[in-house]
Amino acid sequence: MHSRTLIKNAIIVNEGRTFVGSLVIDDDRIEEIIEGKDVKPQLPPDSVIDAEGCYLLPGVIDEHVHFRDPGLTAKGTFYTESRAAAAGGVTTVIDMPNTVPPTVTKERLLQKIELAQQQSLVNFGFFLGATPDNAARLRDVNPRLVAGIKLFMGSSTGELQVEDKPTLRTIFEQSKLPIMVHCEDTPMIMAKMKEYKEKYGQDPHVRYHPEIRPAEACVKSTKEAIALAREFDVKLHVAHITTAAELDLFDPNDKQITAEACLPHLMFANEDYERLGARIKCN
Protein backbone atom coordinates (compact mmCIF):
# COMPACT_ATOMS: atom_id res chain seq x y z
CA MET A 1 0.00 0.00 0.00
CA HIS A 2 1.36 3.39 -1.04
CA SER A 3 2.18 5.68 1.90
CA ARG A 4 3.59 9.17 2.34
CA THR A 5 5.04 10.21 5.70
CA LEU A 6 5.98 13.72 6.78
CA ILE A 7 8.55 14.17 9.56
CA LYS A 8 8.19 17.85 10.39
CA ASN A 9 10.14 20.52 12.25
CA ALA A 10 13.14 18.31 13.01
CA ILE A 11 16.69 19.54 13.48
CA ILE A 12 18.12 18.08 10.28
CA VAL A 13 21.84 17.28 10.05
CA ASN A 14 22.87 16.69 6.45
CA GLU A 15 25.83 17.38 4.15
CA GLY A 16 27.69 19.55 6.64
CA ARG A 17 24.67 21.66 7.61
CA THR A 18 22.26 21.74 10.56
CA PHE A 19 18.85 23.36 10.11
CA VAL A 20 15.20 23.07 11.13
CA GLY A 21 13.11 21.45 8.46
CA SER A 22 10.92 18.58 7.35
CA LEU A 23 11.37 15.34 5.45
CA VAL A 24 8.91 13.61 3.14
CA ILE A 25 9.18 9.83 2.76
CA ASP A 26 7.32 8.22 -0.15
CA ASP A 27 7.06 4.52 0.72
CA ASP A 28 10.70 3.71 1.56
CA ARG A 29 12.36 6.59 -0.30
CA ILE A 30 13.17 10.13 0.78
CA GLU A 31 11.27 12.33 -1.66
CA GLU A 32 11.77 15.82 -0.33
CA ILE A 33 13.81 17.76 2.24
CA ILE A 34 12.16 21.07 3.14
CA GLU A 35 14.01 23.81 5.00
CA GLY A 36 12.09 25.93 7.51
CA LYS A 37 9.50 25.43 10.22
CA ASP A 38 5.91 24.37 9.42
CA VAL A 39 6.55 24.43 5.66
CA LYS A 40 4.01 22.31 3.80
CA PRO A 41 5.15 19.63 1.32
CA GLN A 42 4.07 19.64 -2.33
CA LEU A 43 1.61 16.78 -1.78
CA PRO A 44 -0.39 16.02 1.39
CA PRO A 45 1.05 13.22 3.58
CA ASP A 46 -0.81 10.18 4.88
CA SER A 47 0.83 10.48 8.29
CA VAL A 48 2.72 13.17 10.18
CA ILE A 49 5.43 12.84 12.84
CA ASP A 50 6.12 16.02 14.79
CA ALA A 51 9.86 15.89 15.53
CA GLU A 52 10.28 19.37 16.98
CA GLY A 53 13.34 19.45 19.22
CA CYS A 54 14.63 16.12 17.87
CA TYR A 55 17.61 15.56 15.59
CA LEU A 56 17.10 13.85 12.24
CA LEU A 57 20.26 12.32 10.76
CA PRO A 58 21.03 10.25 7.66
CA GLY A 59 21.72 6.57 8.20
CA VAL A 60 25.08 6.16 9.92
CA ILE A 61 27.95 4.30 8.23
CA ASP A 62 29.98 2.29 10.75
CA GLU A 63 33.23 1.37 9.03
CA HIS A 64 34.56 -0.77 11.89
CA VAL A 65 32.36 -3.60 13.12
CA HIS A 66 33.11 -7.11 14.37
CA PHE A 67 30.07 -9.26 13.61
CA ARG A 68 32.02 -12.47 14.49
CA ASP A 69 30.40 -14.50 11.72
CA PRO A 70 31.61 -17.09 10.76
CA GLY A 71 33.22 -19.05 13.57
CA LEU A 72 32.53 -16.91 16.62
CA THR A 73 28.75 -16.88 16.50
CA ALA A 74 28.35 -17.38 20.26
CA LYS A 75 29.24 -13.68 20.38
CA GLY A 76 27.10 -12.54 17.45
CA THR A 77 25.90 -13.24 13.91
CA PHE A 78 25.15 -11.11 10.88
CA TYR A 79 21.49 -11.19 11.88
CA THR A 80 21.87 -10.24 15.55
CA GLU A 81 24.49 -7.54 14.99
CA SER A 82 22.85 -6.00 11.93
CA ARG A 83 19.58 -5.91 13.87
CA ALA A 84 21.34 -3.98 16.63
CA ALA A 85 22.88 -1.68 14.03
CA ALA A 86 19.51 -0.90 12.46
CA ALA A 87 17.99 -0.21 15.88
CA GLY A 88 20.73 2.36 16.50
CA GLY A 89 20.34 4.14 13.16
CA VAL A 90 23.33 2.48 11.50
CA THR A 91 22.37 1.55 7.94
CA THR A 92 25.75 0.50 6.52
CA VAL A 93 28.51 -1.53 8.18
CA ILE A 94 31.97 -2.70 7.12
CA ASP A 95 33.02 -5.89 8.86
CA MET A 96 36.50 -6.83 10.06
CA PRO A 97 38.36 -9.94 8.82
CA ASN A 98 39.44 -11.55 12.13
CA THR A 99 36.78 -14.25 12.14
CA VAL A 100 37.27 -18.05 12.12
CA PRO A 101 38.58 -18.70 9.56
CA PRO A 102 39.99 -15.22 8.90
CA THR A 103 38.85 -13.39 5.77
CA VAL A 104 42.13 -13.39 3.87
CA THR A 105 41.23 -15.05 0.54
CA LYS A 106 38.67 -14.43 -2.18
CA GLU A 107 36.96 -17.74 -1.40
CA ARG A 108 36.45 -16.84 2.27
CA LEU A 109 35.29 -13.37 1.31
CA LEU A 110 32.63 -14.80 -1.02
CA GLN A 111 31.46 -17.14 1.74
CA LYS A 112 31.10 -14.18 4.06
CA ILE A 113 29.20 -12.19 1.45
CA GLU A 114 26.78 -15.09 1.04
CA LEU A 115 26.23 -15.25 4.81
CA ALA A 116 25.54 -11.54 4.97
CA GLN A 117 23.16 -11.65 2.00
CA GLN A 118 21.11 -14.25 3.85
CA GLN A 119 21.07 -12.57 7.26
CA SER A 120 21.96 -8.89 7.28
CA LEU A 121 19.26 -6.27 7.83
CA VAL A 122 21.52 -3.39 6.75
CA ASN A 123 23.91 -2.63 3.90
CA PHE A 124 27.32 -4.22 4.34
CA GLY A 125 30.89 -4.34 3.11
CA PHE A 126 34.06 -6.14 4.14
CA PHE A 127 37.73 -5.64 4.84
CA LEU A 128 40.22 -8.21 3.57
CA GLY A 129 42.90 -9.13 6.10
CA ALA A 130 46.50 -8.54 5.01
CA THR A 131 48.94 -11.40 5.68
CA PRO A 132 52.42 -12.43 4.53
CA ASP A 133 50.71 -14.98 2.26
CA ASN A 134 48.54 -12.52 0.33
CA ALA A 135 50.65 -9.34 0.57
CA ALA A 136 52.10 -9.61 -2.93
CA ARG A 137 48.62 -10.08 -4.46
CA LEU A 138 46.78 -7.17 -2.85
CA ARG A 139 47.09 -5.16 -6.05
CA ASP A 140 44.69 -7.63 -7.68
CA VAL A 141 41.91 -7.32 -5.07
CA ASN A 142 38.56 -6.49 -6.67
CA PRO A 143 37.31 -3.14 -5.26
CA ARG A 144 33.74 -4.24 -6.00
CA LEU A 145 34.12 -6.96 -3.37
CA VAL A 146 36.34 -5.28 -0.79
CA ALA A 147 36.02 -1.90 0.92
CA GLY A 148 39.61 -1.87 2.12
CA ILE A 149 42.54 -3.79 3.56
CA LYS A 150 42.80 -4.43 7.31
CA LEU A 151 46.32 -4.62 8.68
CA PHE A 152 47.12 -5.69 12.23
CA MET A 153 50.49 -4.18 13.18
CA GLY A 154 49.81 -5.24 16.76
CA SER A 155 48.53 -8.41 18.39
CA SER A 156 44.77 -8.85 18.58
CA THR A 157 42.19 -11.56 18.03
CA GLY A 158 42.51 -13.62 14.88
CA GLU A 159 46.23 -14.41 14.45
CA LEU A 160 46.56 -11.76 11.73
CA GLN A 161 49.48 -9.80 13.15
CA VAL A 162 52.09 -8.57 10.65
CA GLU A 163 55.36 -7.16 12.01
CA ASP A 164 57.93 -8.20 9.44
CA LYS A 165 59.22 -4.95 7.92
CA PRO A 166 59.60 -6.21 4.32
CA THR A 167 56.05 -7.63 4.43
CA LEU A 168 54.69 -4.33 5.75
CA ARG A 169 56.36 -2.49 2.89
CA THR A 170 54.91 -4.96 0.38
CA ILE A 171 51.40 -4.47 1.77
CA PHE A 172 51.60 -0.69 1.45
CA GLU A 173 53.23 -0.92 -1.97
CA GLN A 174 50.69 -3.38 -3.40
CA SER A 175 47.43 -2.08 -1.96
CA LYS A 176 45.36 0.17 -4.20
CA LEU A 177 42.57 0.26 -1.63
CA PRO A 178 42.46 2.18 1.66
CA ILE A 179 44.31 0.45 4.50
CA MET A 180 42.86 0.40 7.99
CA VAL A 181 45.53 -0.41 10.54
CA HIS A 182 45.59 -1.58 14.15
CA CYS A 183 48.72 0.10 15.50
CA GLU A 184 50.65 -1.28 18.47
CA ASP A 185 54.32 -2.16 18.89
CA THR A 186 54.11 -5.76 20.09
CA PRO A 187 57.81 -6.19 21.07
CA MET A 188 57.47 -3.20 23.40
CA ILE A 189 54.29 -4.66 24.90
CA MET A 190 55.82 -8.11 25.34
CA ALA A 191 58.83 -6.60 27.10
CA LYS A 192 56.51 -4.70 29.44
CA MET A 193 54.47 -7.84 30.11
CA LYS A 194 57.63 -9.76 31.01
CA GLU A 195 58.71 -6.96 33.34
CA TYR A 196 55.35 -6.80 35.14
CA LYS A 197 55.04 -10.58 35.48
CA GLU A 198 58.44 -10.65 37.12
CA LYS A 199 57.25 -7.95 39.54
CA TYR A 200 53.67 -9.04 40.22
CA GLY A 201 53.35 -12.70 39.18
CA GLN A 202 51.78 -14.40 36.18
CA ASP A 203 48.52 -12.44 36.36
CA PRO A 204 49.26 -8.74 37.03
CA HIS A 205 46.30 -6.70 38.27
CA VAL A 206 44.29 -5.02 35.54
CA ARG A 207 45.31 -1.62 36.95
CA TYR A 208 48.67 -2.19 35.22
CA HIS A 209 47.10 -2.69 31.79
CA PRO A 210 47.81 0.87 30.54
CA GLU A 211 51.42 0.46 31.64
CA ILE A 212 51.83 -2.96 30.01
CA ARG A 213 50.27 -1.66 26.77
CA PRO A 214 51.63 1.90 26.99
CA ALA A 215 50.68 4.82 24.79
CA GLU A 216 54.25 4.82 23.46
CA ALA A 217 53.60 1.45 21.80
CA CYS A 218 50.69 2.95 19.87
CA VAL A 219 52.51 6.15 18.98
CA LYS A 220 55.57 4.31 17.66
CA SER A 221 53.51 1.97 15.47
CA THR A 222 51.26 4.78 14.23
CA LYS A 223 54.25 6.85 13.16
CA GLU A 224 55.54 3.87 11.19
CA ALA A 225 52.20 3.34 9.44
CA ILE A 226 51.90 7.03 8.54
CA ALA A 227 55.44 7.05 7.11
CA LEU A 228 54.65 4.01 4.92
CA ALA A 229 51.39 5.56 3.71
CA ARG A 230 53.22 8.74 2.74
CA GLU A 231 55.99 6.82 0.99
CA PHE A 232 53.62 4.71 -1.11
CA ASP A 233 50.81 7.30 -1.45
CA VAL A 234 48.17 5.06 0.11
CA LYS A 235 45.02 6.13 1.94
CA LEU A 236 45.41 5.17 5.59
CA HIS A 237 42.89 4.99 8.42
CA VAL A 238 44.24 4.30 11.91
CA ALA A 239 41.77 2.39 14.07
CA HIS A 240 40.80 3.16 17.67
CA ILE A 241 43.42 5.68 18.74
CA THR A 242 43.44 6.01 22.52
CA THR A 243 45.46 9.07 23.55
CA ALA A 244 46.00 12.74 22.76
CA ALA A 245 49.59 11.87 21.81
CA GLU A 246 48.28 9.79 18.91
CA LEU A 247 45.74 12.43 17.91
CA ASP A 248 48.54 14.97 17.56
CA LEU A 249 49.98 12.89 14.70
CA PHE A 250 47.02 13.70 12.45
CA ASP A 251 46.01 16.79 10.47
CA PRO A 252 42.21 17.19 10.32
CA ASN A 253 42.55 18.72 6.85
CA ASP A 254 44.49 15.74 5.48
CA LYS A 255 41.98 13.32 3.98
CA GLN A 256 44.66 10.82 2.92
CA ILE A 257 45.51 9.86 6.50
CA THR A 258 42.66 9.70 9.01
CA ALA A 259 41.88 8.16 12.38
CA GLU A 260 39.01 7.08 14.60
CA ALA A 261 38.34 6.81 18.33
CA CYS A 262 36.09 4.43 20.23
CA LEU A 263 33.61 5.52 22.88
CA PRO A 264 35.30 3.69 25.82
CA HIS A 265 38.53 5.57 25.20
CA LEU A 266 36.60 8.85 25.39
CA MET A 267 34.55 7.93 28.46
CA PHE A 268 37.13 6.32 30.75
CA ALA A 269 40.63 7.06 32.06
CA ASN A 270 43.40 4.90 33.51
CA GLU A 271 42.21 5.68 37.03
CA ASP A 272 38.91 3.91 36.32
CA TYR A 273 40.57 0.47 36.34
CA GLU A 274 40.51 0.52 40.15
CA ARG A 275 36.74 0.96 40.12
CA LEU A 276 35.65 -0.96 37.02
CA GLY A 277 38.42 -3.52 36.58
CA ALA A 278 38.48 -5.67 33.44
CA ARG A 279 35.11 -4.34 32.26
CA ILE A 280 36.93 -1.48 30.56
CA LYS A 281 40.04 -3.43 29.52
CA CYS A 282 40.74 -3.05 25.82
CA ASN A 283 43.92 -3.31 23.76
Question: Where do the model's predicted regions map?
Answer:
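N-terminal metal-binding scaffold of metallo-dependent hydrolase/deaminase domains
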Residues: 1-42
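Divalent metal-coordination and catalytic microenvironments
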Residues: 10, 23, 28, 53, ...
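Short, surface-exposed connector motifs at secondary-structure boundaries
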Residues: 90-94, 119-123, 226-235
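Alpha-helix-loop-beta-strand connector modules within alpha/beta enzyme cores
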Residues: 106-122, 170-181
